[in-house]
Amino acid sequence: MMMTKQKNSLAERLNIGEEVRELKLGATFNPKNTSTAFHTIKYDFKPASVDTSRMASVDVGSNNQVTVTVPNSESSGVPHTVYKGNQREYAKECLMIYDKETGAITIEKLNHNIQVKKTRNEVANKSVQLPGQNASVNMGQGQLHSQGANGSVPGPISAPGHSTGTAPKMENSTMRISTKTKVSTGSRRNNIIDFKPRNSPMQQSSPSRAVPVHRSPQSAPAWDANNAQQTLPSIPLITDDDDFGLRAALHNSGHANTSGSSTGSATGQPDFGSTSSSSHMGKQRQAPPHGHGKRQQMQQRLSPPMAQQQQPSNYGRGYNGGHNHVQQQQQRNSPQQQRPPAYGHGNSMPMDLDSTREHELTSQSVAQAAAALEQQIGGALSASSSSSESDSSDSDSGSDSDDSTEDDRPTQGQQQDHQQQQQQQVYQNHNHQQQQIAQQHLNQLPNLGLGSISPAYGSNHQHQQQMAPHQQQQKQQSGIYASNGGFPNDLLQNDLQLSSNSSDDDDE
């Protein structure tokens, strides 16, 4: 029944009656046939604009490539449609041809089966789209050339015959390329700006040079150098604390050199390494000779006449004590004159303050020594007056003692002059040594900009040299007893008179 239905449908469709017809074999079944061939073409898409009144063309190329060109109607605006595909041979397929006029049916063999697809490189589309494509490609090339990037331009150029369907894709691809190149070139520009101070040889002529200059850490000290407060800590400062530290060091060295100062004062040469502490210790050592001489004088007045013959040796001890006292007073002044070179490395103000303090200490020590000697002189005068009253009853012995004292006065004056000359020589030698040591200190000082320090030192040294004779004059004015072991000339004469009287009594 299905066959009848199919036949009925086929007979109805072909308008063939139910009658039996003869089937003829075509020329394709003839082996000698070379001019007739039947092919089937299968299209994927057939536009409605195809003009069936005109002939189409089929072009078979190498490798079984087939190009089919179908003409289109003039109203479509496109002259023809091009199909391309491949072909393959048939083996068992046949074609039946029905002739409506004669009613004959002919069967033919099929040669090739061709399957084609519509291409998008039509001539009309090609002529219309090429200006736009070229413009877009040129724009893309211009952007790439201006921005310095390499784009894949040969892709759109290699397909110049595409249809309108690829135009948006090509434009989109061009836009993608341009946007990508913009992003990439933007990042490259930033990288060039960042790396230009390191690698670029034209970094001086680049207008973006100012940006890395502010970022560079090497330019930071240039900004900090304008601020004076930040550079001050790098300059070494010498303050009053440093002066006190030097003073403490000199004080410790004075304790260490106490023995040296005592030996120097005993030999008549001042010790310049000693300080005020050694001078105070020298005062303590000075006191026993005076006290010892005073006790011996009191014992001489109370002792028998034979024991009074040892009195000149006691006066010699007193002279030695006075000479040591003068040398120790000069030794007190020597640290003052040595101190300015030590303080020459610092500021000049502490040097002046120390000189005034030392001057005050020296004046106080001189005043104390003068008061102690005056007390000793007063005690000695009272003792001598009592002894002179007890011995004044003997006139003969007094006349003899006058002769003896008159004989002794010239010798005493010569001794005093000789002692004064020795003191002046010692003082001159002391000043000469001080000048030499000061000159050595000036020569040994490093060249640290001492132009501002040396005038202060010179003025202070000159002031001390002027003060030294003044102090020496005060010492001489404080009492004539300083050169004679701490006793005045009258007291010495009275004591010598008493000793001569006692010697006369022994002779009688």
From Swiss-Prot:
Using the UniProt annotation, give all residue ranges assigned to the region (Disordered).
140-226, 251-508
Q: Does the keyword Transcription regulation apply?
A: yes
**Modified residue Phosphoserine is at which positions?**
S200
Molecular function (GO) terms for this protein are: transcription elongation factor activity
Compartments it resides in: Nucleus
> What's in the keyword line of the UniProt record?
Activator, Developmental protein, Nucleus, Phosphoprotein, Transcription, Transcription regulation
Q: Does the keyword Phosphoprotein apply?
A: yes
Protein name, per record: Ell-associated factor Eaf
The source organism is: Drosophila erecta
Q: Give the encoding gene's name.
A: Eaf
